[in-house]
């Protein structure tokens, strides 16, 4: 369980998050939604310990600030929305997922190498292992970065809009990989901007608007929540049409 209590974040005196209190159960799939500038990415970074905050973040009942680097790596893996594209091969990048567990020399053990191979296989990256990262398409690179996160072998995976810049086919492939990880027991917490996609893949949602948590709960409950319309000027409804891409659709409000 990841627990947040009274989380506040400010940048230059301007509040980005205001008194956010919520929790993310072990083994859940949660999407964080909200309008641009609502605080979604800031919340994810605070949970990962990458943004200064006031309040308390607890992971497995332990204050995040009290966890060692290795203990934190066992609990949380974080994939930001924007990443560099270093001039290295795919195997090396995936191996970086093991670095938080290693000593100063960053020498991989047999267990580390096995986890790297398993992560590549699981994410469909095994055929890419010998290729340079800069040679890959956007969808291939995103799978490789996800493989790096999987190789870290953390209990919870935090992802900031992982489907950004991907075409529909690669989005669906990525979501299928995340669902596979979720079924295997990983906790998935994902920032998403596509409402039908978020409502369709998540078991629970958190709505941030203006840095404030305005609603939370399962998709069918949030469909009717007035905070959704206030945030987006639109609402979400179940979509049972057989040719629909997702189980929910966005509808305009009068």
Predicted regions located by residue number:
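Conserved ABC transporter NBD signature motif
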Residues: 55-63, 72
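Catalytic Walker B motif of ABC-type/P-loop ATPase nucleotide-binding domains
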Residues: 157-161
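Conserved ABC ATPase signature
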Residues: 107, 132-136, 140
């Amino acid at each position: 369980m990841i627990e947040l209590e009274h989380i506040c974040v400010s940048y230059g005196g301007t509040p980005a998050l205001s008194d956010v209190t919520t929790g993310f159960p072990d083994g859940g799939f949660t999407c964080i939604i909200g309008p641009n500038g609502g605080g979604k990415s800031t919340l994810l970074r605070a949970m990962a310990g990458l943004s200064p905050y006031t309040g308390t973040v607890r992971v497995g009942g332990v204050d995040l600030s009290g966890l060692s680097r290795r203990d934190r790596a066992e609990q949380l893996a974080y994939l930001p929305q924007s990443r560099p594209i270093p001039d290295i091969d795919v195997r090396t990048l995936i191996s970086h997922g093991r670095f938080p567990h290693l000593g100063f020399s960053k020498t991989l053990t047999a267990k580390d190498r096995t986890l790297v191979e398993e992560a590549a296989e699981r994410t469909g990256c095994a055929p890419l292992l010998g290729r340079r990262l800069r040679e890959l398409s956007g969808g291939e690179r995103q799978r490789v970065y996800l493989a790096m996160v999987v190789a870290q072998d953390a209990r919870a995976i935090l992802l900031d809009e992982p489907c950004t810049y991907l075409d529909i086919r690669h989005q669906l492939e990525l979501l299928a990989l995340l669902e596979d990880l979720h079924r295997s027991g990983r906790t998935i917490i994902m920032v998403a901007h596509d409402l039908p996609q978020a409502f369709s893949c998540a078991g629970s949602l958190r709505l941030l608007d203006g840095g404030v948590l305005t609603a939370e709960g399962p998709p069918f409950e949030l469909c009717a929540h007035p905070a959704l319309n206030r945030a987006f000027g639109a609402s979400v409804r179940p979509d049972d049409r057989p040719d629909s891409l997702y189980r929910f659709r966005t509808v305009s409000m009068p």
